[in-house]
């Protein structure tokens, strides 16, 4: 999830090597070099950025390996990473699940091409350590990095390991996870997060003195969550106006017009936005958050210490969002509602029965569940392996 805007790093000159994507050349001499591999979704990219920024602060020269995108649509990482001042490398490879039989037929050729491109990148960048944070792009690059003798540090963000990390975990030098029990031999450290999530005041301090309508934050992510966009306005319309919360509803830019129409049709006032500038602050300000249960979202909410109603994305691979949410929900740190069980009447009833006292207790429970030193642990592993 996490579509918050981060500040860019120091500017660096740009060149375009033949046959490759734009690369920002870093001029520091003698620095240790890290190759960070992550792509596809914000759940992989934003933890990778947290690690990359921490490595840069420690004097490392950081290159990022991601995908180029397809069908005229650039990859998310190619849009997010270069503006933050990191050298960006790319190869041609993307997911295979749900793409049809032809994708599997041509997979061997695509893999060979991606293996060769990965070898070229690793030889050019000469990393002291390679850090993989998931996404299909990490498979060919991770395997070739190991083949070329480069130390590999792996981090799995979800409570159910993805296909790529299941394979790479067998050859990595260090394996970390955001949730417990993902791999038999791994270190549970939590998710790498920006410091802003960790530095928020504790829930008791934030809730002290709050009065009036509840503050409800609905988070749909970069693409929006159509089910939430349709259901929440209808649920609010069923509540007496005096009992309605103050609502901020974030949806992706592609769905913002439809979201405005939904609220207008329901006759409900709300602050509607295509993105959130400061997600950590928005989480801290909310009494209750309604959101999906991507790994970054769950761990960011826990780090802040916020109360959330999780509605897992029903098509998530291996239903990992449900497992992510249960990490908090089973300990009283949130609520879980499957999309198939959602109704406007049920949500309206829940909102009317919810008070700040219960939300504070939920937020306090969530806060106790999150480890907050994941970024430091990953950076320390990189420095140990690079010696």
From Swiss-Prot:
Localisation: Cell inner membrane
Pfam families: Glyco_tran_28_C, Glyco_transf_28
Residues where UDP-N-acetyl-alpha-D-glucosamine binds: 41-43, 158, 194, 222, 276, 321
Region listing for Disordered, in residue ranges: 1-22
EC assignment: 2.4.1.227
GO CC term, one of those recorded: plasma membrane
GO MF entry, a single one: UDP-N-acetyl-D-glucosamine:N-acetylmuramoyl-L-alanyl-D-glutamyl-meso-2,6-diaminopimelyl-D-alanyl-D-alanine-diphosphoundecaprenol 4-beta-N-acetylglucosaminlytransferase activity
Recorded metabolic or biological pathway in which this protein acts: Cell wall biogenesis; peptidoglycan biosynthesis
BP-aspect Gene Ontology terms: carbohydrate metabolic process; cell division; cell wall organization; lipid glycosylation; peptidoglycan biosynthetic process; regulation of cell shape
Catalysed transformations (reactions): di-trans,octa-cis-undecaprenyl diphospho-N-acetyl-alpha-D-muramoyl-L-alanyl-D-glutamyl-meso-2,6-diaminopimeloyl-D-alanyl-D-alanine + UDP-N-acetyl-alpha-D-glucosamine = di-trans,octa-cis-undecaprenyl diphospho-[N-acetyl-alpha-D-glucosaminyl-(1->4)]-N-acetyl-alpha-D-muramoyl-L-alanyl-D-glutamyl-meso-2,6-diaminopimeloyl-D-alanyl-D-alanine + UDP + H(+)
Membrane topology: Peripheral membrane protein
InterPro entries per UniProt: GlcNAc_MurG, Glyco_trans_28_C, GlycoTrans_28_N
Main location group: membrane
Keywords in alphabetical order: Cell cycle, Cell division, Cell inner membrane, Cell membrane, Cell shape, Cell wall biogenesis/degradation, Glycosyltransferase, Membrane, Peptidoglycan synthesis, Transferase
Enzyme class, UniProt record, top EC level: transferase
Job description of the protein: Cell wall formation. Catalyzes the transfer of a GlcNAc subunit on undecaprenyl-pyrophosphoryl-MurNAc-pentapeptide (lipid intermediate I) to form undecaprenyl-pyrophosphoryl-MurNAc-(pentapeptide)GlcNAc (lipid intermediate II).
Family per record: Belongs to the glycosyltransferase 28 family. MurG subfamily.
UniProt xrefs under PANTHER family: GLYCOSYLTRANSFERASE (PTHR21015:SF22), UDP-N-ACETYLGLUCOSAMINE--N-ACETYLMURAMYL-(PENTAPEPTIDE) PYROPHOSPHORYL-UNDECAPRENOL N-ACETYLGLUCOSAMINE TRANSFERASE 1 (PTHR21015)
Protein name in UniProt: UDP-N-acetylglucosamine--N-acetylmuramyl-(pentapeptide) pyrophosphoryl-undecaprenol N-acetylglucosamine transferase
Protein species of origin: Polaromonas sp. (strain JS666 / ATCC BAA-500)
Lineage: Bacteria, Pseudomonadati, Pseudomonadota, Betaproteobacteria, Burkholderiales
Gene that encodes the chain: murG
């Amino acid at each position: 999830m996490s579509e918050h805007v981060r500040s860019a790093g120091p500017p660096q000159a740009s060149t375009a090597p033949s046959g490759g994507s734009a690369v920002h050349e870093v001029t520091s001499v003698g620095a240790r070099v890290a190759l960070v591999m992550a792509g596809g979704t914000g759940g992989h990219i934003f933890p990778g950025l947290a690690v990359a920024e921490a490595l840069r602060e420690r004097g490392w020269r950081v290159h990022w390996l991601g995908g180029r995108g397809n069908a005229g649509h650039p990859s998310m990482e190619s849009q997010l990473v270069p503006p933050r001042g990191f050298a960006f490398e790319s190869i041609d490879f993307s997911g295979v699940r749900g793409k049809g039989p032809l994708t599997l037929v041509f997979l061997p050729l695509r893999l060979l091409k991606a293996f060769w491109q990965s070898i070229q990148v690793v030889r050019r960048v000469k990393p002291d350590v390679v850090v993989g944070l998931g996404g299909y792009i990490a498979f060919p690059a991770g395997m070739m990095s190991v083949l070329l003798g480069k130390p590999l540090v792996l981090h799995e963000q979800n409570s159910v390991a993805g296909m790529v990390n299941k394979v790479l975990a067998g050859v990595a030098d260090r394996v970390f996870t955001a949730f417990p029990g993902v791999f038999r031999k791994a270190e549970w450290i939590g998710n790498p997060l920006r410091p802003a999530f960790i530095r928020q005041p504790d829930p008791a301090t934030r809730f002290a003195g709050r009065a009036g309508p509840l503050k409800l934050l609905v988070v749909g992510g970069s693409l929006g969550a159509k089910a939430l966009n349709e259901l929440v306005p209808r649920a609010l319309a069923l509540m007496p106006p005096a009992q309605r919360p103050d609502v901020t509803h974030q949806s992706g830019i592609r769905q913002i017009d439809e979201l405005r129409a939904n609220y207008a049709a329901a006759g409900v006032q709300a602050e509607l936005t295509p993105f959130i500038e400061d997600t950590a602050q928005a989480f801290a300000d909310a009494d209750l958050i309604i959101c999906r249960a991507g790994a970054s979202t769950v761990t960011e909410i826990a780090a802040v210490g916020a109360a959330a109603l999780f509605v897992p994305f029903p098509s998530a691979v291996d239903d990992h969002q449900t497992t992510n949410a249960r990490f908090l929900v089973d300990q009283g740190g949130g609520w879980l509602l499957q999309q198939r069980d959602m109704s406007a009447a049920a949500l309206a009833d829940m909102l009317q029965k919810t008070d700040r006292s219960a939300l504070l207790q939920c937020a306090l429970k969530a806060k106790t569940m999150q480890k907050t030193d994941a970024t430091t642990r990953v950076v320390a592993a990189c420095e140990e392996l690079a010696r």
